[in-house]
Amino acid sequence: MTLWELVERRSIEAPEAISILFSEKHLTNRAFRDEALRVARGLRELGVGRGDVVAVQLPNIPEYLLSYAAICALGATLQPVHLPYRRAELTTLLGHSGAKAFVCLSRLKDERPPGLKNVVSLGEPEDGAIPFSSLLAKTSLEKPYDGSPDDRFLLLYTSGTTDNPKGVPHAQRGFLANAASSVPELEISRTEVVLSAAPLTHLYGLYAYHVSLCSGATMSLLPAFTPDGLSETVGKHKANCIFAGPAHFKPLLDGGLLERHDFSSVRFACLSGSPVPPELAAAVEKKLPKGKTLQLWGMTELQAGSFSRPRDPAEVRHGTAGAATPGTELRVVDERLQVRGVSLFSEYLKNPEETRKAFTADGWFETGDTAQLSGAGHLRFTGRVKEIINRGGVKYSPLDVEAIIDRMPDVARSAIVPYPDVVLGERACVFVQPKAGAAAVTLEAIMRELDRAGVAKFKWPERLERIEAMPLTPTQKVMRGRLRELLKN
């Protein structure tokens, strides 16, 4: 089944059920289908057809999902574009993909990338852009593309925390099977409300939508994350299943928002996107009146690779990323996590060399993560291969050390990266972003904290750099490559 066929099926089986909740508004399944067909007609008149790429740079609003469904109704491919990206990133990514159209907010970031002809914008159009409202005013597309599940429908780009982003094409069969198999494991029903704090421009946000679509559940849209905004939306829309990151829930904990707002509807909060400290997962669960915290591990190349289940005991849900998603296999070779399965991509776009390097001789994908698998198949991450620090031949991941430093009262966020050393090969430097108004953190204070925690001295950072704002990807991952460049300069 294709994504458009899922949209059609929902409109037939439950036409008046709610497809999307947004602020005080909603769209039924029938209304969503009808509006998507009008958008599809408008895109077709711009020349978009089977196999073409349409880039979308929108927040979590109905127009994003209407564009997505319309693109699939044409047999075309969605290219999500992160909201912070500006002309330099747009020129690179849209040039690489060969995007035929670009759907964005009312103002292009800086100016239109060269060679981009068809721009559809919300609000007042500029520079010859076409207003999105004119697409909604069209008559419906009469004959949606009768597509195959093996057709490409998504073109994602890796987050580029250490390297230049790579294009990752995906067919419908694998991704939708991955989402559909997640539904019974997460026990999601069509009467529930799914909410993603992650942007729809990122795979984690799209996964939440895929799960809601496959289950028949309602999708609650949060246009931009703020702690108050997330808390208020959960209460207003009675969200049951929340997909978010640790960076979304930590300010809710620190600010007491889980007590002040109504989270009684929440059945689970699934955390992903960056390492989840077990104590954070436990603290969130303690504050949820009826909910549990889960963890999920996924990749641009895979979608959901593993997750803990609501039925799992607390130590599994809080301390691991659970067991493999149905249809996915995991193995650890020399501490390196490898994966294969139905939703795994087959090749990087226009990049055979990176494709060759990404797979083992027997067909397993090298994730770039270091991990451990328990006897029961539960996955626990120990770091990234490129983040491992090799100090005099002794290798270690800095993640556990960072977690301890992050608990210090004056630290907002920390990240440890290696720097070259003539004697030992590498030593560790810690970058610290202080909390607003906090006292300056010293290397001596960090060493005392690590000493109290019983951390082996070879793991202690030997250099401290204070940074006003940690460089982050749009999905809140630390850009360690950028930090290493700062050290070089």
Predicted feature descriptions by range:
Residues 16, 121, 139-157, 163-164, ...:
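Conserved pre-ATP/AMP-binding loop-to-beta segment of ANL
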Residues 16-61, 65-69, 86-91, 133, ...:
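Conserved AMP-binding/adenylate-forming core of the ANL superfamily
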Residues 28-31, 153-177:
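Conserved AMP-binding A3 loop
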Residues 323-327, 333-358, 396:
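Conserved ATP/PPi-binding loop(s) of AMP-dependent carboxylate-activating enzymes
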